[in-house]
């Protein structure tokens, strides 16, 4: 009986993180193979066509996160842990403006004229106050093809969005702004995640 129970237990809850079960899903008529344990929304944890899939991965391992620990009275006062995850969303774009085109044609209308060079080829340009992106900054490394739109640190830490289009779907990655101090590593991680999600079933 114990063996039967083990075999019937959902694979996303028991598969080792080093080799998670993968689900073939179609988003925007584009095939992706996603680790079941990385799917954040239970109703999205199935194969076949979907409008959107929301995922999370630990960084820098890029493995699905472990199941959250149950919070009790003895743990609720513990210090909040730093974010160590990349959140990813795959959504059908329905022929909306591509992310790279938005960077070229939309964002410049709302950016300040001056830019600030940062470490290792990264540039920062602030969005003007009173615009749709007021209170945010655009980070770009043109030679590396890296762009991220980020909120600023306030009551909560700033977060960044990096987007890319894959055929009929847009991938949106979210990660802490503080990670930009090692932006090349983050950019490489996003490239690897994209390749993994587009990889063959296995």
Residues covered by each model-derived region:
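Surface-exposed amphipathic alpha-helical segments
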Residues: 168-202
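Extracytoplasmic/periplasmic/luminal assembly and interaction segments
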Residues: 33-91
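A mature extracytoplasmic/lumenal domain signature
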Residues: 38, 152, 175-177
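Hydrophobic membrane-insertion alpha-helices, especially the h-region
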Residues: 1-10
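Extended hydrophobic
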Residues: 156-172
């Amino acid at each position: 009986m114990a063996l039967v129970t083990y075999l019937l237990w959902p694979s996303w809850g028991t598969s080792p993180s080093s080799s998670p079960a993968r689900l073939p899903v179609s988003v925007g008529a584009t095939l992706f193979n996603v680790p079941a344990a990385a799917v954040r929304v239970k109703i999205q944890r199935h194969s076949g066509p979907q409008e959107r899939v929301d995922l999370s991965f630990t960084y820098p391992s890029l493995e699905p996160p472990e199941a959250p620990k149950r919070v009790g009275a003895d743990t609720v006062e513990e210090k909040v842990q730093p974010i160590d995850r990349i959140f990813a969303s795959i959504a059908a774009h329905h022929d909306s403006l591509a992310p790279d085109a938005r960077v070229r044609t939309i964002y410049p209308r709302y950016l300040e004229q001056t830019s600030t060079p940062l470490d290792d080829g990264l540039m920062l340009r602030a969005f003007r106050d009173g615009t749709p992106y007021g209170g945010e900054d655009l980070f770009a490394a043109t030679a590396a093809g890296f762009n991220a739109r980020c909120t600023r640190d306030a009551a909560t830490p700033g977060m960044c969005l990096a987007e890319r289009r894959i055929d009929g779907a847009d991938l949106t990655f979210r990660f802490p702004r503080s990670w930009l101090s090692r932006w090349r590593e983050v950019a490489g991680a996003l490239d690897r995640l994209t390749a993994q999600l587009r990889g063959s079933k296995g």
